[in-house]
Amino acid sequence: MSVLWRISNHSDLSGEGGRRGSARWHTRGRPIVYLADSPASAMLEIVHLQDGNGKLPSFYHLLEIRAPEDLPIKDLLTMADAGWKQKLELTQRIGNAWLASLATPLARVPSAIVPRTWNYLLNPEHPDAGHVKIESVVRERFDDRLFRFGPR
């Protein structure tokens, strides 16, 4: 089993958040679940999700997610593809095409935040998406030091 991670206040893999808003690898209206290969990567990927005051909520849920080793994963983009971080429309087009194709339940994409790190996308509409399951959910408090910048 492969282990993937997600930080969310919703303990499901429905992809409903993707229906409500666009992100790096999809446009609004499409169910999708963003996953990371470690809890630390999942934490760093949510930096941009601060509230309007630049703050994160006090608590979060860390989801440990299991996928069978033999579940197909498609690489959507290599880290060598130059300039992709600045081409949001390109990455959204690639992600939307993958979602529509139902080619694989999981896709691997490079992190735009952490160099040489991979993230994963789950297409909840793929027939084999049900094999990807939440193993555990732990409620944790954000460490105040984590996102504090500037003088101490």
Regions found by a protein language model. Name each.
Residues 48-56:
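Short helix-loop boundary/capping segments at the starts of domains
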Residues 1-18, 26-27, 55-152:
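Active-site and NAD+-binding cores of ADP-ribose-processing enzymes
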Residues 27-49, 120-125:
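Extended catalytic/binding region for NAD+/ADP-ribose chemistry, centered on the ART fold
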